[in-house]
A protein has these predicted regions:
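Vicinal oxygen chelate
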Residues: 2-4, 10, 14, 82-83, ...
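Short, flexible, solvent-exposed loop/turn segments with mixed acidic/basic and small polar residues
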Residues: 2-3, 58-63
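Short, charged/polar, Gly/Pro-enriched secondary-structure boundary elements
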Residues: 51-58, 113-116
């Protein structure tokens, strides 16, 4: 079993068709601040004051998450977590992937077929080609 103190929901993605409409909806309903993140079609929403227990929410093109909301759970060691997924009867869908200067992510399906994301914080993940973030 992974450490209970670090296995909390830290991020989830909501598939969208219209970022302005979706951002306005969540801003109106929950008061979340919406901001475009980087050069890709990706928007983040702040759900609470740091360092509170709130999760980060993102709006992502529907094509990238056709099944609906995707919840990410923070783990201490993503490799160990993926091993635990397999040992418990789950299936790894997307193996360990880098998020430069942020950490690592992966996705799996549990025994009931639900898609769940994993996230490990690691600010040392390099930027491809040695570039810098803006």
């Amino acid at each position: 079993m992974l450490g209970a103190m670090t296995s909390r929901v830290v991020h989830f993605e909501i598939p969208i068709d219209d970022p302005d409409r979706a951002g306005g909806f969540y801003r109106t309903v929950f008061g979340w601040n919406v901001a475009k993140w980087g050069p890709v079609d990706y928007w983040t929403m702040t759900t609470g004051a740091e360092p509170g227990p709130g999760a980060e929410v993102a709006l992502t093109p529907r094509a990238e998450a056709p099944e609906g909301v995707l919840v990410y759970v923070e783990v201490e060691d993503i490799d160990r977590a993926l091993s635990s997924v397999k040992d418990a009867g789950g299936t790894v869908v997307t193996g360990k992937m880098p998020i430069p200067t942020v950490g690592w992510s992966a996705r799996f399906r549990g025994t009931e077929g639900n898609l769940v994301g994993l996230f490990q914080t690691d600010p040392t993940v390099p930027i491809p080609g040695g570039g810098v973030t803006s």
